[in-house]
Design a protein with these regions (language model features):
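Extended beta-strand/loop cores of jelly-roll/beta-sandwich
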Residues: 1-177, 184-189, 261-292
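Functional-site microenvironments in short loops/helix caps that host divalent-cation chemistry
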Residues: 72, 148-149, 155-269, 279
């Protein structure tokens, strides 16, 4: 586990001198496995929009596995939905939809905020070709269809396929609290991409199939630069690391939601594996920040 105070929160990072930031990023790069290099930083404009200063989110590229990782700075956040938040959700969602969603909304258990240490997370869901270069996917499984023939596509894999891939590459799954923290972008946001109900039907592109499209990426990214958190992913529970969940919303309810089911974009959805056909989900690759 790293002990770098500058990574404890976005505020700490922004108050750090540029020379020290560069020193920390260089030390992280040197602590990562061979084959990593610096990637173009993501410019977060969230603070600039509320009168602050835009800041660069450091990114690292794993050439061997063709994966870009973002340095997710630590911070405190409310893990799960508070009682007040549940009341707000209940009042904002049609009763029929709420009755279906309520059993899988993750309610807050902690008395206070949970601290998430900094870690590295893939900017995109893991693509099919990356998985297939390392493990053989089981044939005969019906995997989610996508609305466009243009790729690349995020891979939907079984738990067993995911375990084999992680063992082969040295990556890990996000802990469940890490995923929810990034989905909320360090704030109390209602939806995984933004803070308002989308004003159009997302059924055609909820999985954001054209990740190579820069405009789509910018539209889908949260303030950390994370793209397409709506794609369902496996997570692990800290209290029981052998227990997996599926997080993300939207695509977690396969087939994809229609216009009247926007509530499925809720950040706090925490689904048992049985909720996905074939117990399949996507992968968001993570690494711990190296000790410096």
């Amino acid at each position: 586990m790293h002990t770098i105070p500058e990574l404890a929160s976005p505020k700490s990072w922004q108050s750090t001198l540029p020379s020290r930031r560069a020193e920390i990023c260089q030390a992280i790069l040197e602590g990562l496995p061979r084959g990593f290099e610096f990637a173009k930083p993501f410019l977060s404009t969230e603070l600039a929009e509320v009168g602050g200063t835009a800041w660069e989110v450091p990114c690292f590229y794993d050439a061997q596995h063709e994966t870009t990782l973002t340095l997710v700075l630590g911070d405190d956040f409310t893990y799960g939905a508070t009682a007040q938040r549940l009341d707000k959700l209940r009042d904002s969602i049609p009763a029929e939809d709420w009755s279906l969603i309520a059993p899988v909304v993750h309610a807050a258990q902690e008395a206070g905020p949970v601290h998430v240490p900094a870690f590295l997370m893939g900017r995109f869901p893991t693509f099919e070709w990356v998985i297939e270069e390392h493990v053989e996917l089981c044939e005969g499984l019906e995997r989610p269809d996508f609305s466009s023939e243009d790729g690349p596509f995020p891979a939907y894999v079984t738990q067993e396929e995911a375990q084999r891939f992680l063992a082969a590459t040295g990556y890990r799954l996000p802990w469940d609290h890490e995923w929810e923290y990034v989905a909320k972008a360090g704030m109390e946001r209602l939806y995984v991409c933004g803070d308002a109900v989308p004003q159009r039907d997302l059924s055609g592109d909820v999985c954001l199939t054209q990740f190579g499209d820069g405009q789509l990426n910018r539209a889908a990214a949260n303030p950390w630069g994370m793209v397409a958190l709506a794609v369902a992913t496996f997570t692990r529970l800290q209290a029981s690391p052998h227990e997996w969940r599926i997080r993300g919303g939207a695509a977690a309810f396969y087939p994809f939601q229609h216009r009247m089911q926007q509530a499925m974009l809720l950040t706090e959805l925490q689904l048992p594996l049985a909720n996905m056909p074939g117990q399949m989900a996507g992968l968001r690759l993570c690494l711990d920040v190296p000790a410096i």
